[in-house]
Each structure stands twice: as structure tokens, then as C-alpha cells.
């Protein structure tokens, strides 16, 4: 895996090693792995900020970082956002978007085969930064059998960063200790959703009300949350 020769794991926390010292040691944490890793951070009285700082001080290299924003109220309507992309009501430096009624068509990119419901990718999956917005409630229904209307998280907006982009996001997190600032400054740099106004230039179209709410207008600030979970054998 990743051309490493050995790997060790406990729960969903994976460590890859190689006799080639140039490659170093790779720590891989997916969603569940992050929750389990937080149990160790909690026991050590450390935060994610402490861990990331220690990793950088020791010469760590960030290969990938995902920042996820959970929508608990359904403010993100993914079919509506997809329609806005088609109607040129998505103002973005990205040149591409893709939408799927389920995760089937991109299962080589996703761990979860068909369990993502409506999914919208903004940006190229090959680039160092792109966004993935999907119906988390549908995923929870497929995986855990939780009825869609009872799911605590309706949608998830993921910022996926690789290499240099991941490094600069970590640097921003460690400069401001404000995950909301870091996440939304990235989103606002790359994309905004607007409402078409026939008598105005596209650059002057107003932000969509729902999108304005999502990015911070008239809502409570967000914080970097931790939800430590023990691993199960």
C-alpha cells in the first residue's frame, strides 16, 4: 500500500513503514480512525492542534487533510446546488463539477461504495484541492439503518486537500486556532453560489440566501469538535 512494505494497525489507525528511510513512516487516519485517535489525545491531554504542531516540528509532511463540515439542519440542498452549477449560478475558480445520484460511479475514489446518496464534487478529483458535498443521512441509513429523517447529520461538506494545500491549511489552523476560519476561508476562496439576476452582470449576482447562511451569515460560529471513540476488535 502506497509502496510501503509493512503496516500496523489498531482499530482504524494505520501506520505504514518501509526499510527505505527516505519514505519515513506514514500515519493514515480516516474518519473512524480520527475518532479513535482522539481517545489517545484525550488521555494525553493534547488537542489536534498540539498533535499537528508536534508533527510539523518533527519534520512531518502533510500528504492529505480533509476538513468536514456537518450540516445538522439540512441547510445544504445538494440537488439544488447541483442545479445551480448547471445554471451557471456557481461562481468558482474550479472548471469542473460532477454530480451523482449515488456514490456508485466514483467508488474507486471512495471507501464507501454506493452509500453516499446525492453527491456533488466541485473541482477535479485529481487536483490538490476539491470539495465533496454528500447526503450523510443516506450514508447513515445504508450503513447503520438509521431512518433518514432521524439522522443527526443531514449533509456533509468536505474540503479535500493534498500536499502543499494540506500543509498551508495546517499552517493556517496553527496560526489562528480557529477551524471555522480556516475551512470557510478555503471555501470562500474557491466557490460561491448566487441567484441569477437578469439585469446584472454575473459578478454582481447576490449570494443565495441558503448559501449565505451556510458560510456564516446569521448563524452560530463553528468549532473544531472532537468525539473520541474507543476502537472495537
Language-model features: where?
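Structured, helix-rich domain cores that form ligand/interaction pockets
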Residues: 1-231
Amino acid at each position: 500500500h502506497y509502496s510501503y512494505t509493512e503496516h500496523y494497525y489498531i482499530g482504524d489507525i494505520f501506520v505504514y513503514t518501509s526499510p527505505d528511510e527516505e519514505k519515513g513512516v506514514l500515519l493514515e487516519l480516516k474518519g473512524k480512525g480520527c475518532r479513535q485517535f482522539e481517545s489517545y489525545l484525550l488521555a494525553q491531554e493534547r488537542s489536534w492542534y498540539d498533535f499537528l504542531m508536534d508533527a510539523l516540528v518533527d519534520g512531518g509532511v502533510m500528504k492529505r487533510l480533509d476538513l468536514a463540515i456537518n450540516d445538522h439542519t439540512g441547510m445544504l440542498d445538494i440537488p439544488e446546488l447541483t442545479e445551480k452549477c448547471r445554471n451557471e449560478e456557481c461562481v468558482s475558480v474550479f472548471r469542473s463539477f460532477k454530480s451523482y445520484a449515488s456514490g456508485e460511479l466514483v467508488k474507486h475514489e471512495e471507501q464507501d461504495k454506493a452509500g453516499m446518496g446525492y453527491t456533488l464534487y466541485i473541482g477535479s478529483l485529481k487536483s490538490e484541492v476539491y470539495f465533496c458535498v454528500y447526503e450523510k443521512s443516506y450514508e447513515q441509513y445504508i450503513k447503520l439503518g438509521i431512518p433518514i429523517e432521524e439522522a443527526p447529520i443531514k449533509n456533509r461538506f468536505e474540503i479535500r486537500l493534498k500536499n502543499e494545500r494540506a500543509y498551508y491549511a495546517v499552517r493556517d489552523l496553527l496560526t489562528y486556532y480557529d477551524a471555522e476560519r480556516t475551512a470557510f476561508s478555503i471555501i470562500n476562496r474557491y466557490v460561491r453560489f448566487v441567484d441569477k439576476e437578469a439585469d446584472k452582470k454575473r459578478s454582481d449576482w447576490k449570494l443565495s440566501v441558503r448559501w449565505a447562511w451556510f458560510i456564516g451569515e446569521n448563524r452560530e460560529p463553528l468549532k473544531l469538535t472532537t468525539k473520541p471513540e474507543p476502537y472495537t476488535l
